[in-house]
């Protein structure tokens, strides 16, 4: 799971630098594993045809649709709503089917990734944080010896020894 976090971060960095062709494979890997921002970015790349990736309306609406869950950031939800407003009524059922297929393959139930908007205490700025439900099951306290920049060896008397 941690390699996917690396792909999500690297893809995001390249995306922000507008290096879409380089970002795409990293974002796609993270998107397939359930990371909402990566899903939205893959959808946007398909929607706009960026970085040499051919425009693909079905893939664009599918990826942005799965990213636009209730707990997604407002920007993702609003972008999806804007896309849906441009869909002719005769194609709504087709679009619903595409989004349903993507949600069944890459949504929370399929990937085990849960996302929430979180805020730092005292701040009005929220960020979308996604975690795999089993991400920490196989880790122990020694794997998390630096949490929030503080060594657990400095703060946890159980780890100091006699």
Q: What is the role of each PLM region?
A:
Residues 54-75, 81-82, 88, 93-106:
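TPR/TPR-like (Sel1-like) alpha-helical repeat modules
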Residues 22-26:
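Repeat-mediated protein-protein interaction surfaces in helical alpha-solenoids
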Residues 5-16, 41-48, 78-84:
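Hydrophobic face of amphipathic alpha-helices that form TPR/SEL1-like repeat modules
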Residues 89-137, 141:
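Pro/Ala/Gly-rich low-complexity, hydrophilic intrinsically disordered segments
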Residues 35, 41-51, 64-65:
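Consensus positions within tandem repeat domains that build extended binding/scaffold surfaces
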Residues 2-3, 7, 14, 18, ...:
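Short helix-capping/linker turns of helical repeat alpha-solenoids
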Residues 141-161:
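Short, low-complexity, Pro/Ser/Thr/Gly-rich segments in the mature regions of secreted, periplasmic
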Residues 29-30, 67:
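Canonical positions in the second alpha-helix
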């Amino acid at each position: 799971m941690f390699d996917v976090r690396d792909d999500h971060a690297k893809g995001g960095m390249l995306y922000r630098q507008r290096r879409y062709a380089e970002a795409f494979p990293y974002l796609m890997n993270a998107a397939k594993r359930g990371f909402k921002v990566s899903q939205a970015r893959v959808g946007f790349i398909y929607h706009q045809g960026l970085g040499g990736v051919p425009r693909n309306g079905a893939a664009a609406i599918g990826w942005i649709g799965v990213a636009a869950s209730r707990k997604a950031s407002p920007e993702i939800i609003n972008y999806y709503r804007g896309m849906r407003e441009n869909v002719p009524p005769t194609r709504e059922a087709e679009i619903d089917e595409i989004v349903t297929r993507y949600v069944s393959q890459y949504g929370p139930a399929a990937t085990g990734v849960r996302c929430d908007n979180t805020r730092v205490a005292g701040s009005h700025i929220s960020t979308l944080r996604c975690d795999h439900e089993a991400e920490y099951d196989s880790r122990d306290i020694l794997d998390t010896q630096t949490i929030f920049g503080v060594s657990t060896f400095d703060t946890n008397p159980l780890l100091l020894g006699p």
